[in-house]
Design a protein with these regions (language model features):
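Active-site-adjacent loop/helix segments that line or gate small-molecule/cofactor pockets in enzymes
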Residues: 1-29
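Active-site PLP attachment segment
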Residues: 234, 242-272, 284-289
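Conserved PLP-dependent catalytic core of the aminotransferase class-I/II
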Residues: 300-354
């Protein structure tokens, strides 16, 4: 595989919507990715939180290959076994009652908005359809989920947008109370704002919002697209907050590398969705569900205990590094804020040069390693980061320009 040829072909035929690194990844195993030139990278991105079991986990590969060789797709006009098995496992893990499968986080959040509005219109009439989200939130790039996203930077040039959305600052309960007038049907929030800088919400604030929503019968939607499926050390981030929302959305790490999203809801909401009220041609695809089943079957108590241990080790190590002001997030969803003068994008580029793949979120470095990482993997990542910070490599290496 020729690196220059791959990049040139991509530039010629792929829509230029991504600022890519000049790395062509060719294969991966466990925590390690290898590029077309044979260079190895310790991956602390997991495909933006997707490869929860790392690259080519044996149980995942077998499950996907066996299902692909048996039945790859049917549409939802017929029953298949994998989607029902997966839905049952998700309901048992979340304490909710019904699942709708789609293909992505954006599709899951779009479905959650539809389900919330259907419940509210059926119960209170068409005047009650407002969805309240938080400033600095990110819920997707379809028009409805883009509108739900509380960041103007994503909104430029794509209007007009759907109506009946409102944004309030995270942590400002008075602002939420004011926005939640008679037209409000749902509050939608991420418990850790990923694209918003890897910032966890305050637990007292979350508890107030949950109690308020219950009192007013405003549905509470928790976007767990990035936080869910073990990322924070529990199956749902909701568990850290003792939170029981009406709707939870999942995606990213659920499929272990295959595209799948899920809208998970309680019976109160589910009973309003009837045949024809929502759909997805590929939703519940047997191969994707087989991959997700392998993820959930692997993610037992011992697995989650390791996530918590590695998260504690990583966070303690990061806090001791030079130039680190703050370590934010929850579990293995980690944000790193730096001293003034150090740019996260330059740190990311320096780490990549030294064989460590990391991400950015606003002004912060973001770490989303596969959940299978070991103590040795954490130490290796910390050593690379220490070199980048202490050696000031991050200030000397220029990031490649985005396409």
């Amino acid at each position: 595989m020729n690196t220059e040829k791959v990049i040139s072909r991509d530039n010629d035929y792929i829509l230029h919507t991504y600022g890519r690194s000049q790395v062509v990844l060719a294969e991966g195993k466990g925590m390690t990715a290898r590029d077309a030139d044979g260079k190895e990278y310790l991956d602390f991105t997991s495909g933006i939180g997707v490869n929860s079991l790392g690259y080519c986990h044996p149980a995942w590969v077998k499950a996907v290959a066996d299902q692909a060789a048996t039945l790859q797709h049917t549409s939802n006009l017929y029953y298949t076994a994998p989607d029902g098995k997966l839905a049952k496992k998700i309901c048992r893990r979340t304490g909710l009652d019904a699942v709708f499968f789609g293909n992505s986080g954006a599709e899951a959040n779009e479905g959650a908005i539809k389900c919330a509005r259907k419940y509210s219109v059926d119960t209170y009439g068409e005047s009650r359809s407002k969805v309240i989200t938080l400033v600095n939130s990110f819920h997707g790039r379809t028009l409805a989920t883009l509108t739900a996203t509380g960041q103007d930077v994503f909104h430029h040039d794509f209007g007009p947008f759907p109506g009946n959305f409102a944004y309030v600052p995270a942590g400002d309960f008075a602002a939420l109370e004011k926005a939640a007038d008679a037209s409000a049907c749902a509050v939608m929030m991420e418990l850790v704002q990923g694209e918003g800088g890897v910032v966890a919400l305050d637990a007292d604030y979350v508890a107030k919002v949950a109690a308020f929503c219950k009192e007013k019968d405003i549905l509470l939607i928790v976007d767990e697209v990035q936080t869910g499926v073990g990322r924070t050390g529990k199956f749902l981030a909701c568990e850290h907050f003792d939170l029981h929302p009406d709707i939870v959305t999942l995606a990213k790490g659920l499929g272990g590398g295959l595209p799948i999203g899920a809208v998970v809801m309680n019976k109160k909401v589910a009973e309003h969705m009837k045949p024809g009220s929502h759909g997805s041609t590929f939703g519940g695809n047997p191969v994707c569900c087989a991959g997700a089943l392998a993820v959930l079957d692997t993610m037992d108590e011992e697995f989650l205990a390791n996530v918590n241990e590695r998260a504690a080790q990583l966070r303690a190590g990061l806090a001791k590094l030079p130039h680190v002001q703050q370590v934010s997030g929850l579990g293995l969803m980690v944000g790193i804020a730096f001293d003034d003068g150090i740019k996260a994008a330059d740190v990311r580029a320096a780490c990549e040069k030294q064989g460590l793949l990391v991400l950015t979120a606003k002004t912060r470095l973001r770490l989303l390693p596969p959940l299978i990482l070991t103590a040795e993997d954490v130490n290796a990542a910390l050593d690379t980061l220490r070199t980048a910070f202490g050696g000031k490599t991050c200030l000397l290496y220029t990031s490649p320009s985005p396409r």
